[in-house]
Amino acid sequence: MIPIPSGVRVWIATGHTDMRRGMRSLALTVQESLKRDPHGDLYIFRGRSGDLVNILWHDGLGMSLYAKRLDRGKFISYGLCQPF
């Protein structure tokens, strides 16, 4: 488990994201869609199939991209909200 300091805001992208995208592309999405600097907050992107998420986080030292794939089940979709 990677410790996340208290006070870090977590943003969940609605809809689905192309999971082939890397750190720079996802950071650019955050900048263009939310008009936010991606440094300091944690951003979660869900894949189309629902069993994979990518997590983008800058901890002050550098950008990290984490991936989690479920063996069974799917991550919750927030499709009723506006995608960013």
Predicted regions span which residues?
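Polybasic/polar functional segments that serve as interface/processing modules
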Residues: 1-84
